[in-house]
Structure formats: structure tokens, C-alpha cells
Amino acid sequence: MYPAHLLVLLAVCISLLGASAIPPLPLNLVQFTYLIQCANKGSRASYHYADYGCYCGAGGSGTPVDELDRCCKVHDDCYGEAEKMGCYPKLTMYNYYCGTEGPYCNTKTDCQRYVCACDLQAAKCFARSPYNNKNYNIDTSKRCK
């Protein structure tokens, strides 16, 4: 084998090892990002909502900092209710469509309907709520009490 081939093979192996250490996104999160993009007609990337205020992103505590952050708290609460119903909202896949009037759900099971409704409500709330750049990546230990 040629030295150049060995280098390429080594590089591929190393990159695969690095990729295996990246945890996968919850299945539903991918669908939720598409609902957000459909609802806001692509005006803001979904990742802007991942670390916003006290509730947008992982966890949440305290008083929401604004209307958009309240959307995230309502979404968190909705997922909590889904869990009480025996659903797994972060893993529940559902059918949805992005029409000219925005996104809508088209699902079969109770859990799919409930989780899709949670995500749809949040996506529409995000689309109508102002985004304040000052509330992105805030110090939650100080502002979320």
C-alpha cells in the first residue's frame, strides 16, 4: 500500500472516531426545527432559539425574560404533560406538513398528535414573538431566578 493511501485511511478512521463521540440529536428535535422554519418562513434559523432566555434550550428555571422565552416555557410544560400521558416527546416522531398557511400536524396516535401540537404551538409562538438579541446566551445563574 502506498504511503498516501495509508494517510487517507488514517484520516478517515480518525474522523469516524470523532464523529462517534458526538451524541445524536433527539429524533423529534429535527422535526421541531423544520416546524420552526416553516412557521417563521425561514426568517430566523432554528439554532437561534437553542440558547435564548431562561427556557429556550435544555432545562429552564425562573421567570421567562420575554414573550419568546414564555413560548419556550409553555413548550417545556407541554412536553411535561405529554410525559405524564406516558409519551416520550423528545423521541416521538409525527407527520406534519408545511403548507402555504404554515405548518400543520397530520398524525395517527394520541402521543404523536399531542407532541406535534406542542411543537406546532411553540413554532407559531416563536414566529409571532419579537427576538431580542440581548436575551441570547444570557447568564442564567443571574437572570433566571
From Swiss-Prot:
GO terms assigned for molecular function: calcium ion binding; calcium-dependent phospholipase A2 activity; phospholipid binding
A biological-process GO annotation: phospholipid metabolic process
Enzyme Commission number(s) from the entry: 3.1.1.4
Any Pfam family matching the protein: Phospholip_A2_1
Propeptide positions: 22-27
Organism domain of life: Eukaryota
Any one GO cellular component localisation term in the record: extracellular region
Calcium in keyword set: yes
The protein's name: Basic phospholipase A2 cPm05
Organism: Laticauda semifasciata (Black-banded sea krait)
Phylogenetic classification of the source organism: Eukaryota, Metazoa, Chordata, Craniata, Vertebrata
